[in-house]
UniProtKB/Swiss-Prot annotation:
UniProt organism field: Symbiobacterium thermophilum (strain DSM 24528 / JCM 14929 / IAM 14863 / T)
Catalytic activity of the protein: an N-acyl-L-alpha-aminoacyl-tRNA + H2O = an N-acyl-L-amino acid + a tRNA + H(+)
EC numbers on record: 3.1.1.29
Protein family: Belongs to the PTH family.
Name recorded for this polypeptide: Peptidyl-tRNA hydrolase
Top-level taxonomy: Bacteria, Bacillati, Bacillota, Clostridia, Eubacteriales
């Protein structure tokens, strides 16, 4: 049995510190804490592996390199290769409807307008997979949504997201150890 943790984002230095890359930021924080290098190429992305818990369960950490709107291709390839059921895939991504740094876990649900999640749902053929959303806040007046998500965080929002990352990493650890319901009960803010 294996699990797949996916951080949604866009590749390249231009997007590295943008709001839309909050999923990658969280995946990187988890990988750093557990000494995993996410640098193997495959599944139209970069991935790394670790063993988790007393049973040394395989956990794959994946960053799709397809750009956000095609992320599902990468996720589906990795899930098929490792024979991972949707319930064992945790997708990490940004959410406009949550204040910066707020966390929300769900066992399943709609894409909520997030194109990366829409792609994952389309490629997996189901919306029945766990997800962890990281708040990035709504656009400031005068901003279009696309410009907002592809812009870097302002200083206050960057601080809020950075402060939330350790708790978000703990939420991922809880998902791996105890499952999505325990993680939801403990870490939804």
């Amino acid at each position: 049995m294996a699990k797949l943790i996916v951080g949604l984002g866009n590749p390249g230095p231009r997007y590295a510190a943008t709001r839309h890359n909050a999923g990658w930021m969280l995946l990187d924080a988890f990988a750093r804490k557990h000494g995993v290098a996410i640098e193997q190429r495959g599944f139209e992305g970069l991935y790394g592996e670790l063993r988790w818990g007393a049973e040394a369960e395989k956990v794959i950490l994946l960053k799709p390199l397809t750009y956000m709107n095609l992320s599902g291709r990468s996720v589906a390839q990795a899930a098929r290769f490792y024979r991972i059921a949707p319930a064992d895939i945790l997708v990490l991504f940004d959410d406009l409807d949550l204040e910066p740094g707020r966390l929300r876990l769900r066992a399943k649900g709609s894409a909520g307008g997030h194109n990366g999640v829409k792609s994952v749902i389309a490629e997996l053929g189901t919306a029945e997979f766990p997800r962890l959303r990281i708040g990035i806040g709504r656009p400031a007046p005068g901003w279009e949504v696309i410009d907002w998500v592809l812009a870097p965080f302002g200083p206050d929002d960057a601080a809020a997201v950075a402060a939330a990352l350790p708790r978000a990493v703990e939420a991922v650890e809880c998902f791996l150890t105890e499952g999505i319901l325990a993680a939801m009960n403990r870490y939804n803010t």
